[in-house]
A protein has these predicted regions:
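Glycine-rich, basic loop-to-helix element that forms the pyrophosphate-binding segment
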Residues: 10-27, 48
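Conserved nucleotide-sugar donor-binding catalytic segment
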Residues: 17, 25, 81-170
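GHKL-family ATP-binding catalytic core of two-component histidine kinases
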Residues: 28, 42-43, 106
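The conserved acidic donor/metal-binding loop of glycosyltransferases
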Residues: 36-40, 65
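Conserved donor NDP-sugar-binding/catalytic core segment of glycosyltransferases
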Residues: 44-76
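Flexible helix-coil transition and linker loops at the boundaries of alpha-helical arrays
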Residues: 177-180
Length: 180
């Protein structure tokens, strides 16, 4: 219902990590889900994820499959982007295989793992998923419940063409802080 939807606006654009962290801090529920501006949730997403958690109480995070649209056309993700469930830390190392818009997670994870790293201008999600996947299994609902739209001029990955530099920065931080 509209009565439970609240909006927050930052004084200034400090990037996706700061925006998500604001939402996490302001959230009142025990389950947190994200929706990026260029993605779309399909009907039933939240219900399916809450059902997953009821059936699998050992999980504190799960994601759904996704449909990719690039420049207005449906495309198939490459094999390296294939999603997996369970203990997926090793699959998370080479690239980001968890999508913020596909995830629902228990707020307890943020209390234990921390929030999105606001010092990273990109790959802040990769950084968080690595920290989570090193300690928790990530569930997978094999039905697509989100559409990811890409190929548009203001897509974040176009702003930072050398994304690997931020993944390396995240890995260096994780190693130096003995997170693993």
């Amino acid at each position: 219902p509209a009565s439970v939807i609240r909006f927050f606006r930052s004084e200034k654009n400090r990037g996706p990590a700061a925006a998500r962290n604001l939402g996490i801090r302001e959230a009142r529920g025990e389950w947190i889900a994200f929706l990026d501006s260029d993605d779309e949730w399909l009907p039933g997403k939240l219900k399916a994820q809450l059902g997953f958690f009821r059936e699998n109480p050992e999980y504190l995070i799960c994601q759904t499959e996704e449909i990719w649209i690039r420049n207005g056309k449906r495309v198939n993700p490459m094999k390296k982007h294939q999603k997996s469930g369970g203990w997926i830390f090793d699959k998370c190392l080479p690239l980001c295989v968890v999508s913020p818009s596909a995830v629902m997670m228990h707020r307890k994870l943020f209390e234990e793992i921390g929030l999105f790293d606001e010092s990273l201008p990109a790959c802040e999600d990769y950084d968080l998923w690595l920290r989570i996947a090193s300690r928790y299994p990530i569930g997978l609902i094999e039905k697509p419940y989100i559409i990811k739209y890409g190929g548009h001029a203001d897509q974040r990955s176009r702003e930072f063409p050398a994304m690997d530099q931020f993944r390396i920065r995240s890995l260096a931080k994780i190693l130096s802080q003995n997170i693993l």
